[in-house]
Regions:
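An acidic- and aromatic-residue-enriched active-site/binding cleft used to recognize and process polar
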Residues: 53-55, 95, 128, 194-196, ...
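Alpha-helical scaffold segments that mediate packing/assembly in large oligomeric complexes
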Residues: 99-175
């Protein structure tokens, strides 16, 4: 049997499977929304260029009557990121296909989409939590001294630092759909962290629950807002286990030192990424358990996926990582 890029399925079926993969992946992709997102082009390039235009200087000299002022040129900073390929494979036997009461292809697609989304989101998290603009709860000097929960006072320090660096509020995000589109939002910074901090965030002075947003639409996994910041949560953004100070009141893995949770704050264009969206975002491959030279009895098949991905910090000053503990 002739094999295509997609295994034993046609390009049309592959396109359908890809859309299903992306639909199921969307709920896990918090970071997808807020970066400078680019869709993967059809030529499968191994690098992607992100561009940031530089600010113009001030013009404080009065104009002279009848004299055209000198012109300026736009300047930009280009940052090139290398793309890497990732993928996963689920093996299916002929017995499972013949005897399983559930639709095996659909189930394999479901678990593969979850695997793809969590893989991509974890890769992004590992890059972004390494931001050099770091704050510690209660203004301690290092991670090993962290033993306090998130607070509005600390948030205000972070927002002030972002504003001093002219980090702009987010005014648009990438839509939570398989296609590559954006939508406008009310200006805000965003804070993204682990689900363990949900109660502490809700306990912050001035917190507004998503239930009280009124006409403003809440995002998937959004907790609510506190002043300039809207907060989202995910199980993917795991803490540094036992790396905080000794504690008896904060969450801890070992029972002695606090787990330290990164909260990532973002302004506009703080980071760039390849969106898990669009025609070339992900490639599904389905191999049916049919006889072949390598499998004469047709006992083995598979459902797999692969994607080209990258994430890069574009400006450390336009984002921040705040490390805190979680109340037990």
């Amino acid at each position: 049997m002739a094999m295509t890029t997609y295994g034993d399925i046609t390009p049309r079926t592959a396109a359908y499977v890809a859309v299903e993969l992306l639909k199921r992946a969307m709920p896990y992709l918090c970071l997808e929304k807020f970066g400078q997102a680019k869709s993967l082009p059809g030529n499968k390039t191994q690098s992607m260029k992100f561009r940031r235009y530089n600010s113009l200087g001030l013009r404080t000299t009065p104009l002279t009557e009848g004299v055209t002022p000198s012109s300026e040129k736009l300047t930009a900073t280009d940052i090139t990121a290398t793309l890497y390929q990732y993928g996963g494979l689920v093996e299916i036997t002929d017995i499972i296909v013949d005897t399983h009461e559930d639709p095996v292809l659909q189930e394999a697609t479901a678990v593969s989409s979850e695997q793809a989304a969590k893989t991509v989101e974890t890769l992004r998290y590992n890059v972004l939590k390494a931001c050099t603009n770091v704050f510690y709860a209660n203004s301690v000097a290092s991670r090993g001294l962290v033993a306090a929960a998130i607070s509005r006072a600390d948030q205000r320090k972070i927002v002030r630092a972002l504003e001093r660096q002219e980090a702009q509020h987010l005014t648009s995000i990438v839509k939570s759909t398989p296609s590559f589109n954006t939508e406008s939002i009310l200006p805000a910074y965003v804070g993204i962290t682990h689900v363990d901090l949900t109660s502490d965030i809700r306990s912050m002075d001035g917190f507004t629950s998503v239930a009280d947003y009124g006409k403003q639409q809440a995002w998937e996994t959004e907790i609510g807002a506190c002043e300039d910041v809207r907060y989202l949560k995910s199980t993917i953004f795991t803490p540094y286990e036992d790396e905080g100070a000794a504690t008896s009141t904060m969450l801890t893995t070992s029972g002695s030192k606090a787990d330290v949770y990164p909260v990532m704050y973002f302004g506009k264009d703080a980071y760039g990424l390849i969106a898990l969206k669009g025609k070339y975002a992900i490639t599904p491959i389905v191999i049916n358990p049919v006889p072949s030279k390598s499998d004469p009895l047709g006992q083995r098949g598979s459902v797999s996926w692969k994607t080209m991905q990258t994430t890069i910090i574009l400006n450390d000053a336009w984002m921040a990582v705040y490390e805190c503990a979680a109340t037990d």
